[in-house]
């Protein structure tokens, strides 16, 4: 069997490191062609020594010399740096699939280039579909490229749809742990810190997505993702707070039946399923013990306390470049909150005000989306500055 060549965009992050564990378990099937990181040169070099890729890319050009020095005794591994290198490496002929696991807007252009180069896309970077869902889906159809979801929720929906047509979907059931502040009052939310928000009750993730989970913006992004991945309207996507995080999401069909995917919280499962689809491979890890589950609970989300979820619905219903503005403002306020420059409730207020001020474009091109991203970031930064 010819080994599939994988490029991992964001190999030092939470998804990237777990993807490498999947590769460790299936070295007979998969081989790493390229690893990339933002600025973690030590871990990237360590990964490169273990997996011996043809190339590594560090996005932060100031870290190039450090990475080069760490891999000085590995001359067969080519070392590159910068955004242009990231956008180019995904087009390399030997690559069969690209795991898009970079965080934020930075993952958009490499993913577009990978689609144009007809690489199978395993999508963990949700901002790509949030910002440019129509563009990405049109490109994927044009180039006959499959996009396999890596988010646990979208993988669960995808698995629930095996054997059924998208047209048979009545409703998507998108589950959500509720985050660490599910029981907090508005008054309590005013005083929570980034350290509080980073204590997610179920998943171990990167800092940015953990904050997004605390505000429920992450779930809002997943609503937008689901619209594009499964061809449904936002009104057909129902968010359910499910604190146990055992039901990862599901589908209600036109005949009233429901299919869902259950399992222990382990991101390696959706990563591996995206790699191996349509096959299902063995995976070492914990198994779900239903006898140990005393209850499975489901609640409606409170959009008054967590307005970011409502803002995401508003953005996708308005359409055009509004989801792009939503994402740009969110990246700004998320970083500000992590650096103690913004209170928890001010994140949603800033995002809402940014969306109101951003120039609307009903049919944005890629260039227009890049302009929207820059405009919305500037507006959000200005609003945060005015709050001081």
What are these model-predicted stretches?
Residues 1-388:
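Catalytic, metal-anchored helix/loop core of enzyme active sites in primary metabolism
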């Amino acid at each position: 069997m010819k080994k599939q060549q994988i490029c991992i965009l964001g190999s030092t992050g939470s998804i990237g490191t777990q993807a490498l564990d999947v590769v460790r378990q299936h070295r007979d099937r998969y081989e790493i062609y390229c690893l990339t990181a933002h600025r973690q040169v030590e871990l990237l070099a360590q990964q490169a020594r273990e997996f011996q890729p043809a190339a590594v890319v560090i996005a932060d050009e100031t870290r190039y010399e450090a990475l080069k020095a760490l891999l000085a005794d590995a001359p067969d591994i080519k070392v590159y740096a910068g955004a242009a290198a990231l956008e180019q490496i995904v087009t390399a002929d030997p690559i069969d699939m690209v795991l898009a696991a970079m965080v934020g807007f930075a993952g958009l252009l490499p993913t577009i280039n990978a689609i144009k180069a007809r690489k199978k896309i395993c999508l963990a970077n949700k901002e790509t579909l949030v910002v440019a869902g129509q563009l990405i889906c049109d490109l994927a159809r044009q180039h006959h490229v499959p996009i396999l979801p890596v988010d646990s929720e979208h993988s669960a929906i995808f698995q629930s749809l095996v054997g059924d047509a998208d047209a048979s979907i009545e409703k998507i059931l998108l589950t959500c742990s509720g985050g660490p502040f599910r029981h907090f009052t508005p008054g309590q939310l005013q005083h929570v810190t980034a350290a509080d928000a980073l204590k997610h009750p179920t998943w171990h993730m990167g800092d940015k997505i953990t904050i997004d989970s605390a505000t429920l913006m992450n779930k809002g992004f997943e609503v937008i993702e689901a619209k594009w991945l499964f061809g449904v309207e936002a009104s057909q996507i129902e968010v359910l707070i499910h604190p146990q995080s055992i039901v990862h999401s599901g589908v209600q069909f036109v005949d009233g039946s429901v299919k869902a995917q259950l399992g222990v919280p382990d991101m390696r499962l959706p990563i591996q399923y995206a790699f191996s689809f349509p096959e299902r491979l063995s995976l070492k890890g914990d198994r779900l013990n239903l006898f140990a589950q005393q209850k499975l609970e489901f609640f409606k989300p409170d959009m008054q306390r967590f307005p970011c979820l409502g803002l995401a619905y508003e953005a996708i219903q308005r359409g055009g470049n509004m989801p792009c503005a939503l994402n740009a403002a969110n990246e700004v306020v998320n970083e500000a909150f992590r650096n103690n420059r913004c209170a928890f409730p001010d994140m949603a207020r800033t995002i809402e005000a940014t969306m109101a001020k951003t120039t609307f474009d009903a049919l944005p091109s890629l260039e227009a989306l890049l302009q929207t991203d820059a405009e919305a970031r500037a507006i959000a930064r200005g609003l945060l500055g005015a709050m001081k």
